[in-house]
Amino acid sequence: MLTAFRPNSPTAIVVRAASTNAKKLEEIRERLAKGPNFQDFVQNPDNLKSVGENYDGKLRREKGEEQRLRLPPWLKTTIPMGKNYTKIKEQLRELKLSTVCEEARCPNIGECWGGGENGTQTATIMLMGDTCTRGCRFCSVKTARIPPPLDENEPVNTAKAIASWGLDYIVLTSVDRDDLPDGGSKHIAQTVREIKARNSNIFVECLVPDFRGDLDCVETIANCGLDVYAHNIETVEKLTPYVRDRRAHYRQTLRVLTEAKRFNPNLITKSSIMLGLGETDEEIERTMTDLREAGVECLTLGQYMQPTNKHLKVIEYVTPEKFKHWEERGNDLGFLYTASGPLVRSSYKAGEFFISSILANRKANQSKDSAPKN
């Protein structure tokens, strides 16, 4: 039996409500589709300013306040996907290789593994296992006093995987292995040599530990055939004992970077600073100056993100326009390249694209200089 549809009936009210909700949902989808994403931030600095200035949420946690800050919109990323992303992930599992992209929960994993806007595909392989001997309060990598022994096949397996991926730029990082006499420096160096033996054109960056300040280990890495020697200072001097493991020291980091450049002047040296841990502008400026005086040529600055409830809380979400300010200061201080943005990480691919250009130009100039003159 059919009944008449009455405008004021419960059914009519539900239909009108559903229609209104559908319309609102469509409006939200349209706004999201038309809104800026992180690529827009990279390509258009003006967008950074408007997004940061228009956000009315709380960006700084006051002293003694326990509640976590709400994530601002410029730190939200898309789910990683794509053929190249899937290919790399599957091969990593097959060869039992670890990446810092996954272990450290990097927000840029989809962009880096997939190739992104400029087509430069990058990945960051984490050597010597997934367990570190240090326990920095910002890092989500597992820790143990004595991790499992090194896999002697890892250098060859890593090189084979990288050769099959067709990457342009590879970053090798590692856990700290204070339990080993050489800190694993020979293992890292052998991996670089295996990679270069299979593809001499690929650019290799090594983001390495401080090796407890052992300069023999630093020299081993500096002269193994890599292109970029990276070691992160992580934070300002005042916060270093609070943020990093007690065996890591601010001045020791500067010395490692200085000596790496002395051992091999042709290297590009690189470091990274996290913001949002309670540092002041003056302290950031001092750290950047210290790095430049240590001969560091490339610098990245990014937002610290609390990986789990057990790690340091974020004190402040730094606005995109503030990151832009630090990029400009880096250029003023004379860094060859400064990558500064909320989602920038030490192995961020936009920086690698630029560094690749620097390295290619240097190699071309070296070839010209070594060519026989008529």
Curated annotation (Swiss-Prot):
Domain of life: Eukaryota
Domain Radical SAM core: residue ranges: 117-336
Major localization listed first in the record, in broad terms: mitochondrion
Binding residue positions for [4Fe-4S] cluster 1: 101, 106, 112, 347
Reaction catalysed by this enzyme: [[Fe-S] cluster scaffold protein carrying a second [4Fe-4S](2+) cluster] + N(6)-octanoyl-L-lysyl-[protein] + 2 oxidized [2Fe-2S]-[ferredoxin] + 2 S-adenosyl-L-methionine + 4 H(+) = [[Fe-S] cluster scaffold protein] + N(6)-[(R)-dihydrolipoyl]-L-lysyl-[protein] + 4 Fe(3+) + 2 hydrogen sulfide + 2 5'-deoxyadenosine + 2 L-methionine + 2 reduced [2Fe-2S]-[ferredoxin]
UniProt xrefs under Gene3D superfamilies: Aldolase class I (3.20.20.70)
GO cellular component: mitochondrion
Cofactor: [4Fe-4S] cluster
Pfam families for this protein: LIAS_N, Radical_SAM
NCBIfam families per UniProt: lipA (TIGR00510), PRK05481.1 (NF004019), PRK12928.1 (NF009544)
Annotated family: Belongs to the radical SAM superfamily. Lipoyl synthase family.
Extra information: This protein may be expected to contain an N-terminal transit peptide but none has been predicted.
Protein name: Lipoyl synthase, mitochondrial
Organism encoding this protein: Drosophila pseudoobscura pseudoobscura (Fruit fly)
